[in-house]
Every structure is written in structure tokens, then in C-alpha cells.
A protein has these predicted regions:
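Short active-site oxyanion
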Residues: 99-103, 194-201, 253-255
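C-terminal cap/substrate-recognition subdomain and adjoining C-terminal extension
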Residues: 207-300
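A sequence-level detector for short glycine-anchored, His/Arg-bearing signature motifs
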Residues: 99-115
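Surface-exposed, charge/polar-rich loops and edge strands
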Residues: 4-33, 38, 59, 98, ...
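Short alpha-helix boundary/capping and kink motifs at helix termini
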Residues: 11, 41-103
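Alpha-helical substrate-recognition element adjacent to the catalytic core
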Residues: 58, 142-234
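Well-ordered, non-membrane alpha-helical segments in soluble/globular domains
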Residues: 61-79, 178-188, 209, 286-289
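A short acidic-Thr-Gly-centered motif at the start of a beta-strand
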Residues: 90-99, 138-142, 247-249
Length: 300
């Protein structure tokens, strides 16, 4: 087994060298994203900026071995696939890249197990993550000098069992956009726009930017900025993230951070902040935020 690990480590290093400093993420059209559900392992490339590819960190071979056992079971008898763990059946999250193929964003250990097992193809989900140039374009198109930031998964999306949610979309859209918005989000976003705020939503998860934008359109909720895949590490030696943060501060001297428990106002000019607690009642969450912002406007 140790010899196999060393062999894979060399293969991984060779694959990283093939793409490091060369690859460029490019947009994948809707047809490609809908039709491409599997791809060959030859078209998949490890992400040089992921810890999986760092020589001092690298793969967790215990995890890889667990996936290998499950993949071998599938190869031996496809009927056994129903007994395989959901994680093993989960598609790899990938981005289309130039010059060729797809960059793995999530699922390196499954990719490694598939390679070591000799699988020819593996399920994939193609996403268009927010790129640095997308953020520049959204900043240029934004119309206000104040912004509100919210976390998609922690604040905006609501699992019905956890609290009140907006009504599901009509068929067939409910089968495409499965996420439910928290009750009051469309009304809150409209209120924020009327009062001179650009709404920016963020997520560490690997959602396609256009998927999120279209989801909000279905609910008649406008957002100025969408940033997905924030868990990604910046390329080595890149100062772009710091530059974009500085540009954000220049564009928006005042920012409101909204979460489940409070509204926090941050003034980058005076370097001051103020916190406005919320009651925690999901039924009145959006109205309480409107009241907080209305109070700020009155104090001016």
C-alpha cells in the first residue's frame, strides 16, 4: 500500500505541474452543464491551490482507501451501488478550464480513489464560480455607495423544518431550484434597494453564480453581487483578493452585515461599528431589520 501511495503522489505532482500557471477558468454554458453528468478521468485535473495537492499536506490515504473499497464493489457488481454511501456517489464539483478539461473544486479524494481503482469515468457537476473579473464587473455595475452582505447558506436559504420559508416555486422550476428562501427575503431585498443599498450574497459552497442569480430572479429579488466558492484559496502569490477588498471599501464606505441574530454596521472611513440585536423570531426577522435600517435613516 505504501508503494501505491508513493506512486500516486508522483502522479499527482506530475498532474499539478501540467496545469500550474497555465490553466484559466472559463464559463460553461447551460447546455454543457445540463448534459455533461460524467467525464473521463483524463479530462479531470487536480487543483494546485487545494491542500490536497500541497506536498506537506497532501491526500488522506485512509479516506482514499475507504472510497476505493466502495468503487471496487460497484465495479464488481453494479447492483451493489445501492449499498454504497451517499458520499461515494456524490459527483465531483468541477470548473471548466482552458486549455482543456475540468478543474476539481471539491472531491479530490474520490478522484484519487477512482484513479487507483481504474475507473474510466466518474460523475461530475459543472459549476461557474465567481471569478475575480466577475467581481470587478459587478462593482462597476453597482449603483449605490452602501451595501448589505448576507451568507447564503446560514441566512438567506431556509430549510422549512428550521423555520418559515417563502412559498416553493411553481412546477417545473421547483425541481430546478430546490433551495427555499427565508420568509421575507424578497421584501427585505426590495426595501434595501429602495433605501440605497446594494445587496451582496456570499457562500463558501460551490454554487454556480448564474444559478444563484436566476434563483433570485424567480423570487423577484434583486442582488448586486454574488460571490460563491469563498472557501477557495487564492492562487499562490496572488494579491488580487486584497486589492478587491480595498476596492470594495472604496466603493462602499458603509456596510451592513446581516445574520440571524443581529445587524452590524461597519463604517470603513471612521473604522467604527455598531451592532443592533434581533429578537431571534423568524416570523418577524425581516421586519425587525427594516425597522433597524429605518431607525438609522431617522438618526441622520
Amino acid at each position: 500500500m505504501a508503494g501505491g501511495n508513493i506512486q500516486f503522489q508522483q502522479f499527482l505532482a506530475d498532474e499539478v505541474r501540467k496545469v500550474e500557471g497555465i490553466y484559466v477558468p472559463i464559463h460553461a454554458g447551460i447546455i454543457r452543464r445540463l448534459l455533461v453528468r460524467k467525464t473521463t478521468l483524463k479530462r479531470l485535473h487536480p487543483n494546485p491551490d487545494d491542500e490536497f495537492c500541497f506536498p506537506k499536506i497532501g491526500p488522506n490515504y485512509e479516506i482514499v482507501s475507504n472510497y476505493e473499497r466502495e468503487y471496487r464493489r460497484i465495479r464488481k457488481n453494479k447492483n451493489d451501488a445501492r449499498f454504497v454511501s451517499p458520499a461515494a456517489k456524490e459527483p465531483l464539483t468541477v470548473e471548466r478550464i482552458r486549455p482543456d478539461g475540468y478543474m476539481i473544486m471539491n472531491g479530490h479524494h474520490r478522484w484519487a480513489a477512482a484513479y487507483r481503482t481504474g475507473l474510466k469515468q466518474i460523475p461530475v457537476k459543472i459549476v461557474n464560480l465567481t471569478q475575480e473579473n466577475d467581481i470587478r464587473k459587478m462593482l462597476a455595475a453597482a449603483s449605490h455607495d452602501k451595501r448589505v452582505t448576507l451568507d447564503l447558506d446560514e441566512v438567506v436559504f431556509q430549510k422549512e423544518k428550521n423555520g418559515p420559508a417563502e412559498k416553493p416555486l411553481p412546477f417545473p422550476f421547483r425541481n430546478i431550484y430546490r433551495e427555499r428562501l427565508r420568509l421575507g427575503i424578497p421584501a427585505l431585498f426590495r426595501y434595501l434597494g429602495v433605501h440605497g443599498y446594494d445587496v451582496w450574497v456570499f457562500s463558501a459552497n460551490y454554487y454556480s453564480m448564474d444559478y444563484i442569480r436566476n434563483l433570485f430572479r424567480m423570487y423577484h429579488a434583486h442582488v448586486a453581487g454574488i460571490v460563491t466558492g469563498t472557501a477557495r484559496k487564492a492562487p499562490k502569490g496572488s494579491h488580487t483578493k486584497e486589492q478587491l477588498e480595498n476596492r470594495m471599501k472604496e466603493k462602499y464606505p458603509m456596510t451592513l452585515h446581516i445574520d440571524n441574530a443581529a445587524v452590524t454596521r461597519v463604517d470603513s472611513r471612521t473604522k467604527t461599528f455598531a451592532e443592533f440585536p434581533l429578537s431571534g423570531n423568524d416570523d418577524t426577522w425581516s421586519k425587525e431589520i427594516m425597522d433597524v435600517i429605518g431607525g438609522m435613516e431617522t438618526q441622520k
